Amino acid sequence: HSYAPVPLDGWDKSDTLVYTLPNSIPAGNYEAEIGIRYQESYPYRDIWLEVSHNTKDTLTYVTDTLQLFLVDEAGNKTGNGLCGLYQCDLPYKASIPIRTEGSARTFRIVHIMTDNPLTGISDIGIRLRKPENQ
């Protein structure tokens, strides 16, 4: 995982979290997950994110809109928690192509919730891994 911290006073809609992939990541298809660290005080069951990446063609960004649930219908928090801080890993893409040519390959994440700033989120992360069948 590569995590980016969210400002303590809240995540403003204009605050873009940027993750640059190291050149050491070999080309291929990867599974991608979004990691979310959130506080018990987070007021919603879900979070809406826009995730953009230029991993296939460094000149073109592809944008996905995600609704990720942090609390299930029974009110149980997803992931693991300790001392009021929870962490969960949620699927993003089953197969995302990563190419090595060109300039920096990056992911960009912004929230698209109505609250501005959005409070209760501590960190957002990206995790890439090779599928088990490769």
Where are these regions (language model features)?
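Beta-strand-rich interaction surfaces with strong enrichment in secreted/lumenal proteins
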Residues: 5-9, 19-22, 76-79, 93-98
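Start-of-domain marker
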Residues: 1-52, 57
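Exposed beta-strand and adjacent loop surfaces of beta-rich binding modules
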Residues: 29-31, 46-50, 65, 104, ...
